[in-house]
Amino acid sequence: MEQTLFNPSISMPKSFYHKHITISSRIQCQLSTNSPSSNTKTTTVTVPSKKTMGPYTGRDPNVKKPEWLRQRAPQGERFQEVKHSLSSLKLNTVCEEAQCPNIGECWNGGGDGIATATIMLLGDTCTRGCRFCAVKTSRNPSPPDPLEPQNTALAIASWGVDYIVLTSVDRDDLPDGGSGHFSETVQAMKKLKPEIMVECLTSDFRGDLEAVETLVHSGLDVFAHNIETVKRLQRIVRDPRAGYEQSLSVLKHAKHSKEGMITKSSIMLGLGETDDELKEAMADLRAIDVDILTLGQYLQPTPLHLTVKEYVTPEKFAFWKEYGESIGFRYVASGPMVRSSYRAGELFVKTMVKERSSNSAAKP
C-alpha cells in the first residue's frame, strides 16, 4: 500500500478519529460564545495521550522538518484538465485521498508529457493496520462493488491519461485477496483502451501465488509490490501479516510467471534504517530481478503513527539513485517526495527506451 499523507486542514471522516483517537486521553474544552448559559456551546477535543503512543510512535522534537520538504501548490493546464475530469467521473484516486505531494508533477506529465494517476480499488477500508499508514481499517470491510471493474474502465477510457496505476487496500477477508477483482479491471480497461499502460500496485495476497499469477496474466504492464522498509524493521513498520520474505516471494513469482514482466518495489527512508541494511534490501530485490525501485522520505501522518527518525537529505537520495542503478536496477526514482507511483508512466517509458537502446547497440 502506498504511504498516505495527512493534511490537518482536510476534514477527516468520523471513522478515522474513532479508530485513531478513542484509545487516547480526553481533554474537554468548553467554548462559550457568551457568558455561561443553557445556550453554551461545548466542543470535545480529543488529543493523544503519551501513555498510548507506544515505543515507536509520537513526534521527536529533535527531528525538524527541513525546507526541502515544502512544496508549491500544484498548477498547470494539464493538471486542471485532469482534476476537472476526475471530478466529473467521480473516480477515487490515491493522489487526492493521500494528499500526495507529487500530484502536480504526475497529472501534468512531468518532462515527458505522460500523465499518470493512481486509482484505488476494493474500497477505502483496509483489513490490516500498518504503523505508517493512515488508511482506516476493519476486520470486515464492505464487500467489493461487482460493477467497479467495468465502471472504472469506462471512466478511464474517457479520461485523458496515458498510464494508470491501480492499487487497493489489503483485503484479507476475500478468498483471493482481491486478485480476481484487480484482473477484471485490467482486462476491462485494455478492452476499451488497448494503448493504455497499466501498473498494478498490489498487496501480498497473503502469499497466495495463484492469486499473483491471476493478476500477472490479466494484461497488465507492470507488477508492483512494496517491501516498504528494510528487513530488521518489518515487524515495527508493517502489519504482522505482512513479511519481508513473503513480499520477496510475491515479486519473484510475478517475474517468473510471465516472460518480460516488469516488476517494481518501493522503500521508505527515515525510519531508522542503516546504510548497510538498505544496501542489503536493494541487493535482495535485485537477486529476484526487480526492475524498478522507488525510494522516498517517510512522513508521519499523525502523532499516533511511526516516528520519523531522520529526514534524509536530497544529496543522500541522489547517492542511492546512483548506487541502485549501479547494481542493476533498470530505473531508480529517489528523492524526499518520491512515492510508489511517482511519475510511474515516465519510469516505465524511460525503462523501455533504455532497453531498446541497449538491444540496438548489441546488434551487429
UniProtKB/Swiss-Prot annotation:
At the top level, the lineage of the source is Eukaryota
Q: Name one GO cellular component term.
A: mitochondrion
- Radical SAM core domain residues are 109-330
How is the cofactor bound, in the record's words? Binds 2 [4Fe-4S] clusters per subunit. One cluster is coordinated with 3 cysteines and an exchangeable S-adenosyl-L-methionine.
- The residues listed in the UniProt record as binding [4Fe-4S] cluster 2, with positions renumbered to this chain, are C126, C130, C133
Stretches the record annotates as Disordered: 32-64
Q: Which PROSITE patterns match?
A: RADICAL_SAM
Q: Which cofactor(s) are needed, names only?
A: [4Fe-4S] cluster
Protein name, entry field: Lipoyl synthase, chloroplastic
Q: Which organism is it from?
A: Ricinus communis
